[in-house]
């Protein structure tokens, strides 16, 4: 089979360029100049080089840098007492001026030692260790008779907490009423717990209710939990919930795989 050929009108030549004249976007661009250039640089002329990587510069407000954390969609850091997300101060969020520890799960970032949560997608923040103090009345959540109570009622007691939170009571005059219990329901200004949790229906007490959070020196995310440690103690959250640290309960099958977890080790860490 014979294929057509093109006659060679010019001899084969070889050209070596030893002089780089930089970027020159003019019709008369000389030999050695570059008319079009992408990601190149003339900074090292007469040598040709690629440009350095681009960087973003954010304002720091002039304070001391206390922590930096990469989160989905941007960069979070603390300078002085101000929390920044992608260079914009988080309005109303004032932190302690000092080193920070960050960890994130499910779009919620936890910040220590302030014990604050922040959600970058919504721009919202709040206390990761909410607490309420005041006078409560112990009562039953149903109409059944009985001497023991399963709920506490007080104006505003429902605001800081969620159904399913494990909250710790302190201040009861009856010591056995103090402890950590899981909120089963919230009915207006009433927190409902398991039947017969508290000792006496009708009692009026001044107490404190807190959803506790450990004071971590180091934290990370692994296996759909946030893990934290300080000195000789390691904690992890309830599975999938970055705000539940002292939630210890088995499911209907007796499985505790979703519960929070903590352990004291023999030797403190550094």
Predicted regions and their residues:
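Recognizes the extracellular SEMA beta-propeller fold with strongest preference
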Residues: 1-270
